Regions:
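Non-catalytic C-terminal accessory region of glycerolipid acyltransferases
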Residues: 2-38, 132-247
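Short polar/acidic secondary-structure junctions
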Residues: 67, 80, 185-187
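A transmembrane-helix-recognition feature enriched in membrane-embedded lipid enzymes
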Residues: 25-67, 87, 108-117
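Hydrophobic residues at beta-strand termini and immediately following loops
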Residues: 62, 99, 120-122, 181, ...
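Catalytic core of membrane glycerolipid acyltransferases/transacylases, capturing the structured
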Residues: 69-126, 134
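Short, basic, glycine/proline-bearing loop/turn elements
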Residues: 49-50, 116-122, 152-155
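A generic local structural motif
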Residues: 59-64, 83-85, 132-134, 165-167
């Protein structure tokens, strides 16, 4: 009887177990301001502070579409260094969501920064449903996305690495334009890098169609070849400019 009373007292005085709160996933989208533009103050701050210092050691010059239109679109950029994210950013005062490999999010410092500027983590093979849905969400909210379709930094002598699936499929599904950002050559210290920015293109002939993997590969290759062509066009432009100077 005494034991039963003790057990009853213990049950009454026992503190209820605290339920573990689930960590709420941070909202990936950015609200539009009064002018209807999606601005990331932190990204603008980084551009204002970091870009001038970066330009001193690795100067660059923009060619082509220096001021990209407001609204949803996908930047497609080739990839040499971690600082390549700078080049699309300087073409707009709106925010950009960068699609980055998951490993970058685990890197101390870099991972914190990517999360703070609303980066999207993805597997390198492009088969990441959650990442793709986040991309859709941002574009449908009227925001910009940047994809490096080579999937990794180009450390080879090749003009352009093969493109992974992603950029074309997302642009077609969301019916948004693509803007190419071509880094003409690998950025080097104290040598000017040429950055060529295209006018927006739309893959309207594929809108509303369900494409096979093979068809998407063909469209991805079309994007890749266009960037290679942009490099050749710029080479011709520089050569003609040089000839005029020698006359």
């Amino acid at each position: 009887m005494v034991m039963e009373e003790k057990e009853t007292i213990q049950e009454k005085t026992k503190k209820p177990e605290k339920k573990m709160k689930k960590k709420k996933k941070a909202e990936i989208t950015v609200k539009a301001n009064k002018k209807g533009r999606h601005v990331m103050p932190l990204l603008n701050f980084i551009k204002a502070i970091v870009v001038p210092f970066y330009w001193l050691v690795k100067p660059f010059k923009l060619y082509g579409n220096k001021k990209v239109q407001d609204g949803p679109l996908i930047y497609v950029c080739n990839h040499y260094t971690l600082m390549d994210a700078v080049y699309p950013a300087v073409t707009t005062s709106e925010g950009i969501h960068y699609l980055a490999k998951k490993e970058n999010f685990e890197t101390p410092g870099l991972g914190f920064l990517i999360r703070k500027v609303k980066g999207i983590a993805a597997n390198r093979d492009g088969n990441d449903v959650r990442a793709i849905l986040d991309c859709f969400k941002c574009l449908k909210n009227g925001e910009k996305l940047c994809i490096f379709p080579e999937g990794t930094r180009n450390k080879t002598g090749e003009e352009m690495l093969p493109f992974h699936h992603g950029a074309a499929a997302i642009a077609i599904k969301c019916k948004v334009p693509i803007v190419f950002v071509l880094i003409y050559k690998k950025p080097r210290y104290f040598r000017k890098t040429h950055i060529i920015v295209s006018e927006p293109i739309e893959l309207t002939e594929y809108y509303g169609k369900k494409l096979t993997d093979e068809e998407l590969t063909t469209v991805d290759e079309r994007l890749r070849l266009r960037m290679i062509e942009m490099r050749r066009e710029h080479t011709e432009f520089l050569q003609s400019k040089k000839k005029k100077k020698t006359k």
